[in-house]
Amino acid sequence: MSRVQSIERAFAVLSALTDGPVGVTDVAERADLPKSTAARMLASLAREGAVEQVPGDTRYRLGPRIEALASGLGSSR
C-alpha cells in the first residue's frame, strides 16, 4: 500500500497534542519533523479547526473539529 506523507505528518502533529497544549518546537520534536514543517502543518490544521492556538499563548491544542469527530464515535460503534 502506498503512503501519503502529508496524512502521516498530520496525524503525527495531532498525536503530539494529545497530552495538552504544546508549542511549535515541542510539536516538531514529538512528531519528528522540522520546525518549519510543523509550523505549516499547525497552520493548515488550524484553518480546518483541527487544532487551535491557546488564546494569549503561543501553544496549540486540539481543536473543536477533532472534538466533534471524536464525539461521533460513541454513536457509530
Positions of PLM-derived features:
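N-terminal helix-turn-helix
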Residues: M1-S76
